[in-house]
């Protein structure tokens, strides 16, 4: 069977599409050549309208993903900030639930938001909730199957837990859990709750999807959160506990088991995988 010749140059249709896409989110670029309006109007004007609609729709996606960030800074500030992010970081996937992963880190370096040092961590928490909604499901290990392991301290110390794919740990030097929780209330209750939040306290949380498909935010002590994060990396429980002596291993395990967040149990990882 005769093979078709290898292409020697980019097909003009994809090349035009690439130029069109690039110009949509780069206002310094002119509209791609060859555009025509069906009614004879100026293609550059119509392209500018379309460009604005695309940016506006992406800003709306970010507003839906980060509602508490938007409430904290106000609609106008958020709209301007999100527009800059969209122009700096256009989507790389057609799946809009994946868009905005870089916003928390970007906000941390966004100078106009420096008066709200907790804003980036609030964005991290909200992104973790979105990821929990869309993460793969996994069957939890039955509590009965873990009973023997829990009763054998030496085996327990060597065990590695595979945690549920929806689980994330968020640790912050700011009261991000309290701030996020206050914004889940009505306006009157929210303002009263916010007045009670100590803005210089550190907070941490586990974020995961529960059996009812809700993304929960469960506050826990920072040391316990650090231990949970170590367990999530596959570290043996004994080593994780040694690295975080202030944490309560029993309390962390109880929390993980109660919410069905242990998806597998294994022995210690090979040395080649644990060394760095």
Locate predicted features:
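Long, charge-rich, low-complexity alpha-helical segments
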Residues: 1-72, 76-152, 213, 218-276
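A general structural signal for short secondary-structure junctions and capping/turn motifs
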Residues: 122, 153, 157-162, 195-198, ...
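Short, functional C-terminal segments
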Residues: 127, 133-188
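Low-complexity, glycine/alanine/valine/leucine- and proline-rich hydrophobic stretches
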Residues: 163-233
């Amino acid at each position: 069977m005769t093979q078709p010749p290898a292409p020697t140059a980019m097909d003009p249709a994809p090349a035009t599409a690439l130029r069109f896409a690039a110009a949509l989110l780069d206002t310094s670029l002119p509209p791609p050549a060859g555009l025509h309006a069906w009614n004879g109007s100026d293609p550059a004007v119509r392209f500018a309208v379309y460009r604005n609609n695309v940016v506006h729709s992406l800003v709306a996606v970010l507003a839906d993903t980060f509602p508490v960030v938007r409430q904290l800074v106000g609609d106008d500030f958020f709209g301007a900030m999100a527009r800059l992010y969209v122009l700096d970081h256009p989507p790389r996937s057609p799946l809009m639930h994946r868009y905005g992963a870089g916003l928390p880190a970007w906000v941390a370096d966004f100078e106009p938001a420096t008066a709200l040092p907790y804003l980036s961590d609030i964005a991290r928490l909200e992104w973790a909730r979105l990821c929990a909604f869309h993460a793969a499901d996994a069957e939890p290990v039955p509590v009965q199957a873990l009973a023997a392991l829990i009763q054998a301290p030496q085996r327990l110390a060597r065990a590695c837990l595979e945690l549920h794919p929806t689980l994330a740990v968020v640790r912050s030097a700011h009261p991000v859990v309290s701030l996020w929780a206050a914004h889940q209330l009505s306006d009157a209750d929210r303002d009263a709750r916010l007045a009670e939040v100590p803005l210089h306290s550190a907070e941490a949380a586990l974020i995961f999807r529960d059996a009812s498909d809700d993304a929960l935010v469960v506050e826990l002590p920072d040391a316990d959160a650090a231990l949970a994060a170590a367990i999530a990396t596959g570290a043996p429980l004994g080593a994780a506990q040694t690295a975080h002596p202030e944490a309560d291993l029993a309390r962390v395990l109880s929390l993980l088991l109660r919410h069905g967040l242990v998806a597998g149990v294994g022995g210690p990882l090979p040395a080649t995988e644990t060394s760095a």
